[in-house]
Amino acid sequence: MDDKELLRKLAKKNLRACQLKQLEILKVIDGICKRNGIQYWLDSGTLLGAVRHGGFIPWDDDIDIVMPLGDLRRFERVAAKELPDGLFLQTTKTDPSAKEPIVKVRDLQSLYIEGGDNFVTPYKKGIYVDIFPFVAYPDLAPGLFHKVIPIISKSNSILHHFHRYSLRAFAEFFWFGAKLCAGWLMWGLLSLYPKKNRMGTAPLVNGTGNTHRRSSIFPLTTIRFEDSVFPAPADTDAYLRDLFGDYMQIPPADKRQVHAVYINPDLSR
């Protein structure tokens, strides 16, 4: 057994402890949002898990939620004051070397390592909950966004990935820099159209270009996830079909993979 496979086995062994720690982080976020009138809802695999499994997808090791952009900015301001000791609001401002422009609430007493992580830059690497910004999208055919938006998100991700100096890295900088500029230009042109009926994750962190009708999101409802109830979109069926198609279909065993390559849920032990 090679080192990578050994780490994967350890990650799976610690999966449930990781999930429970993420659930506790989510409960803290939920409390802050309720006290401050901040809207959010379960998204992506977390919402899918709630609908299909009543909680975590058994092999999933992350929690995703979304907030309208204005609510996320408010959350960043209040969370800096209200998060308890041991939790850290990770943004590009609070942790400039973070590998992604995604807001996360991280647990500082754990370690969660993914494939793209590095130990050259000192960003926080604890177990976390992802918080994605939701924005209005132009009232255009959804297929357009599937073509344009991944150009932005994937180019930006590659540009901000850790690179060692090399001719290839130099070439990637110019190639993906040009693609990122082209993607933003196309988004700017699309944004000239009215934005009344569709919303989605902000282009910079929307890897697929998926969007949703506002009517499938609002008014928010609630759904049980593990031992608690959290906000959810109004029409979970339509919302999940936008993301996954036939979302009730269980993937084959070889597709049920955790994201992490190493998980230590408690560094104090």
Regions found by a protein language model. Give the residues of each.
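Conserved catalytic core of two-metal-ion nucleotidyltransferases
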Residues: 2-36, 79-138, 159-164, 168-245, ...
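Active-site nucleotide-donor binding segment shared across nucleotidyl transfer reactions
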Residues: 30-63, 67, 72-73, 242
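Short amphipathic alpha-helical patches
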Residues: 56-57, 71, 155, 263-268
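Short, surface-exposed, charged/polar-biased interaction segments
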Residues: 61, 68, 96, 152, ...
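N-terminal beta-rich core of secreted/periplasmic extracellular enzymes
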Residues: 139, 151-158
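A short secondary-structure junction signal
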Residues: 140-147
